[in-house]
Amino acid sequence: MEDDGRLAPRQIWARPTSTTTRSYVPGCTPFLLPSDGYVYLNRTYSISLGENAIYDPACTSTPTTTEHAGAALDIHDPFYASVTPLLYAMGCATVVSYLLVIILLITPRTFYVGGPGGGANFLGRHGMVSGSYSNNSSVVGVGGRPWLQKVAALLVAISLTIATADSFRVAEKQYDHGYSDAEALTSEVIDGTEIKVVRIISSTFLWLAQVQTLIRLFPRHKEKVMIKWAGFALIVLDTIFAILDKFLVKTNTTRPRLYEDAIPALSYLFELALNLLYAAWVIFYSLSKHRFAFFHPKMRNICLVALLSLCAVLIPVVFFVLDIAKPEIAGWGTYIRWVGSAAASVVVWEWVERIEALERDERKDGILGREVFDGDEMIEVTPSEEVDWPRQQFHGHDRGGGTGMSSAWGGVMGLAHRPLRPRGGRITQTQREAEGATAAKSRKRRSARPTPPPAAVTPVSRADTTSAASTVYNVHYYPVSSPTPPVAMPFMEEEDEGSDGDGEKELAVVQNQQSSLPTQDTYTEPRRQNSPQIVNVDNRWRFILNPFKNRHAALPREVASAQAEEEGFLSPDDQAPRQGDEENPHYTPRHRGLFSFHPMSDGASRRQSGADQPLPVTVIPARRRGQDTWSPQWFTNSNLVDRSSSRRTASRPRDQRMKVIQPQVQSAAPWTAADMEASFSSMDYELRYDPEAAALVSEDIPDHHSQPTQADSPAHPTMSGGNGPSGGETQSALDTGPGIEGSVNEGSVIEGPEESHSQR
């Protein structure tokens, strides 16, 4: 009976007494635990098996729930998707974020010190006061960070600090439970409420800082405005969709490829577009500034800054692509993109500062400033401050970059938009009289030549122009021993080359119309408005334009003969003006009526003569507007000649040294038949203007060249006049000369000896 209670060993499995079979659910089948082993229930309690044991799981209809479904060590994911690379990446990102904060807040300014030998020294602290260096200093300030970058970098550092703390907390929890899961760690940390809020705020300031950096890269004001508003619109859209994605849809952040809704896809799209546009424009700027952006002898470490800048702008774009291609690295790639966006603004700003410092150093000795475009309202703003968002100006030490240089360049750029102001203005009639009375005492030099009128587009009629009324032409004679006078440059004033005060000449304005004419007041104002403006320029220009100024050339014999008669023409008693001459409207003081092309040659001739003697002056008045010009038809058409002879009046001035030709009051021919016979009967030659002699010379008198230079030689043929009417013969002689058309116009003053007409 005792054997009935015992079971054979085979009956444990087979149970031969039972005629039914039992089926087990997969995973619920009992299994044997061999002897000589241990069964661990927890870390402190274990059971030793002295013999075999059977484990029969309690299978139910519902599966057993566990807190963590992963195994103790998940070996299915690669190493770069494990917890260890994730923690290292977060630690590095946090350290970089704090370095950016240190760069922005603790060391706000750096300086570029370029020596005369081309050397460079950066990161040298030379004081915190901007603009404390002179313009000649080679120290160029680089720095001055905008407050948007400071706020963005500080928020990124705070966000990464919170994320790092949460990551270590979750990793420790997984270690306590004996497993490690990187995906679970990332989901628990990034999907936290505090990280979501801080990340949205910091991302908004990061985009604003990047837009501010882009605004600085482009010089045109229109481009700055366009970038500002386009970037602001993209930032608003990205922020709105990010808020909807984080708090409304609550999608899987670590698996961007598994997006099934439109809101997270749009948020991802706007974020990717902002990073792509920023990277593209920074690369374009670096290529446009390739002379300074990648390497420069004065700043050899700029290549390192360029490398860091390019990496900072490309890291967000690269990790956006990797998030789609390899979702396993999306866990720690998010932190890299986060800190990369902060570095893309801070490092690129430093790069731009150094590029502009090199540009300022290169053009500091030039005369050109920075480019100014149409609509640019930031001409005199420093580069570091011109793109700042609205804020109050402080006089702190970290505002603006290179303010010492910008103050100097602001004045240079302002000169480019202001016309040159002449140093000598227009002279009124009262000023002329006052200067004429005191010119002998003051001895002030003025411009040697007036400003030439601008070139006309179409041919101008000589009868309609009013410029001849204010034009003065001077003809001087020089002895054979004097050098050829140099050609004076317009807008230039010759310096006093000698101590002899008699050699100083002044610009003369001759009033060549009588006060009795009714049209005198009509043309006074236009002539005054058309008067030339005088600008004093350095004397060294004369040598550049005329390097052969010391060349000596012999003058024609006619000029030498006229100069010989000029030296002994007047006596010292005639130098004082008579009382009646001052009342004459045609009276002009001698010191105002003379004009010198070269004071040295004129002073030499006067020292040879031993006396300061004035020259006689012939005044050719200007023709009225609308008056007919001289025509060869008057020689053949007697009607024109007879009609003009009845209207012309002649009078002689009181001063015998001056010949005044009366203007034509009506529109009539200036000559009569008798005048032409008297004028041209004894004149069988023509006059031409010789630029070397600066005088009117004859071409038809060959015997003058063979006669020696004497005091009684014939005078220069420029001084015409005779027994006919006082001014008619002179004007006819001047008008008949083929070379006088371009050299002697109406209103001309011709100086020369008076005996010339008596000898002819």
From Swiss-Prot:
It comes from the Eukaryota. Residues 575-585 have a biased composition (Basic and acidic residues). The chain crosses the membrane at residues 86-106, 151-171, 195-215, 229-249, 263-283, 302-322, 329-349. It is found in: Cell membrane. It is a multi-pass membrane protein. InterPro entries: PalH. Coiled coil: none annotated. Pfam families: PalH. Residues 629-642 have a biased composition (Polar residues). GO terms for biological process: cellular response to pH. The keyword Transmembrane helix applies. Residues 1-85, 172-194, 250-262, 323-328 are extracellular. Required for the proteolytic cleavage of the transcription factor pacC in response to alkaline ambient pH. Might be a pH sensor. This is pH-response regulator protein palH/RIM21. The gene is palH.
